[in-house]
Amino acid sequence: MMHLKNITAGNPKTKEQYQLTKQFNIKWLYTEDGKNWYEEQKNFQPDTLKMVYDHNGVIICIEKDVSAINPEGANVVEVPDITANRRADISGKWMFKDGVVIKRTYTEEEQRQQAENEKQSLLQLVRDKTQLWDSQLRLGIISDENKQKLTEWMLYAQKVESTDTSSLPVTFPEQPE
């Protein structure tokens, strides 16, 4: 199985490559050990999956046809076309690590960022949920039931805002009904 690492753009290395670059504006890609990406494609098997992963191991492209891949700035690995590997996708939740395709593991910093993103998303939900009630309150036309809901959601927003996302794991308060 093929595994090409750290593929980057480089200058043409032969007269023919130079002519092709000049004529068709071709970008030449090379692995960290100097192999030409275009020449290496013929060494991939047709019945395998070709996965492109970034410097963190996160899978960013999956193809059966190696010629459909642009691996610039990444790595390409060939894996068997089996159920376990077909479960992977390019959502950012899968990675290639230690020779196998696995569910992604997140660093603490990534987990903190995810928690902060979730916090902002929850606060936006509160704004969306309470916008009409807030307008009704300002106009003095809110029903007692909606006033109670507005209060519950605003108390929830205070709890979300005070949630510390720098300390893992992060637990957010339950949403009002």
Swiss-Prot record:
Q: Provide one Gene Ontology cellular component.
A: host cell cytoplasm
Q: Does the keyword Transmembrane apply?
A: no
Native species: Escherichia phage Mu
Q: Which InterPro entries match?
A: Phage_T4_Gp38_tail_assem
Q: What does this protein do?
A: Chaperone involved in tail fiber assembly. Remains associated to the tail fiber and participates in the host receptor binding. Binds to the primary receptor. Two alternate tail fiber assembly proteins U and U' are encoded extending the host range of the virus.
Q: What is this protein called?
A: Tail fiber assembly protein U'
Keywords of this entry: Host cytoplasm, Host-virus interaction, Late protein, Viral attachment to host adhesion receptor, Viral attachment to host cell, Viral receptor tropism switching, Viral release from host cell, Viral tail assembly, Viral tail fiber assembly, Viral tail fiber protein, Viral tail protein, Virion, Virus entry into host cell
Q: Which family does it belong to?
A: Belongs to the tfa family.
Tell where it localizes.
Answer: Virion; Host cytoplasm
